[in-house]
Amino acid sequence: MSVAVRGVLRRAVDVFRDEPEIAKLLHQQLDRLDEPLRVAIAGKVKAGKSTLLNALVGEDIAPTDAGECTRVVTWYQDGRTPKVVMYPRSGPPTSLPVHRRDGALAIDLQGTAPEQLDRLVVDWPSQSLRTATLIDTPGIASASTEIARRTWAFLAPEDDSLTEADAVIYLMRHLHSADAQFLESFQDQTVARASSVNTIAVLSRADEVGGGRVDGMFSAKAIARRYQAEPTLRSLCQTVIPVAGLLALTGRTLRQAEFAALKKLAHSPREHADAMLLSVDHFLAPDHSAGSSDSETPTSQNALSREIRHSLLERFGLFGIRLSTTLIRQGTDTPSGLAAELVRRSGMNELAEVLHTLFTQRSDLLKARSALRALEHVLSSSTNAATKDLGGDVERILGGAHELTELRLLSAMRSDEVDLPRAEHAEAERLLGGSGVAPAVRLSLSADANPAQLQQAALEALGRWQRHAENPLFSRVAAEACRAVVRSCEGMLTNLPRE
């Protein structure tokens, strides 16, 4: 499909060669096909967007305070050297100094008001950013309507212009009407209309769901499953993943001194440590220092200063401190071991796997979809007589690209527009690539399945869905869906390796 999209874009560039602005836009779409996927991170204020971005990258590069930078749409992309450039709404871009404060990247707008900026672009050498450019957006439903408007304007513009994001990670702490409204507005696009396959929802700050209890993530997972089963949300996003972003970030950036402090706390008398961890106030109280041989009279040698305790709270949160001390008592005795366990329990590994399966593996398709959407937008507003043939080319791509048929059908199925029986409905979603595009995933086989096993499973699925397509009891809509699944099975059989 990407080859066909490149071809029609090149023809469009030639058609609009005398219209510089449009030609420039089309050239940008061609370049975009060779760039990393653009993934926006959105959500309400204090949902943990910047913290999650930092956790995904594994470094403190996105400001997490309520400073001026969090009021600007900020792009983070892979680069050879660190660089920060601000793009004003009018005037040339300006490079900003790159410096760190307390280990985190600090961005100084040098007196420029956030309202005057279109965006910030941060180049940062990062393996994580080579497959996806991450876009941090201001919080929606902000007390400042101007701040919230920027995210709406970027991801769901009202003037019929196009979003620059290929996909979205949407963070929510609870499911509110504002969340559903935002997701609906982002999905309302022309190509593969209302396709939920480019959106993932994250139940953010999941460690706070259980009141900071060590088992709080279990409660968060149950809530995420319940949200995922709700028809409204199911029609708007692929899945819902609970993630404790702060825990993940701290796990990926754990310091030796922090481990030493946690170990000291874990090995202090249990009653004393439990009393400290009752609440934030207890943990920061002047008479609560860890590591004494006597719970009331801690020794100066083993005491944790208030400064250290405050730093631990900022980095781990109360949940992270409770979990870390529990893990250390249970035998996690190295910084690397604790770091790995914190990341594992944060939900970040599950999110990374979902991002790889649903976004990275589908990146060429999602980028091609964005390019077609841009071309459709140009053609719909053009008076150039030569665009008629281009419109026909786009229609042929849309009609012949089974990958887009899969996207549209997956969206329709998640909106309960396809009346298949429950078991067949679930299998159809999987065979269409709803859980990932790899043949083993589509066929519900293990990742190490050999070609013969894949071939056999695909043949069985093909025969099964050919029978479903001829079932006289199925509605016309269901029968059309079955035929699309048949085509997906045929495509797998064509592309599977032979032994």
Kindly give the residue locations of the regions a language model identified.
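Short, flexible helix-adjacent loops and helix caps
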Residues: 14, 61, 211, 363, ...
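Globular "head" domains of long coiled-coil molecular machines
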Residues: 30, 34-275, 345
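C-terminal end of P-loop GTPase domains and the immediately downstream helical coupling element
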Residues: 200, 206-402, 406
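N-terminal J-domain/J-like co-chaperone modules of DnaJ/Hsp40 proteins
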Residues: 404-499
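Charged, amphipathic alpha-helical linker segments immediately N-terminal to NTP-binding catalytic cores
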Residues: 1-17
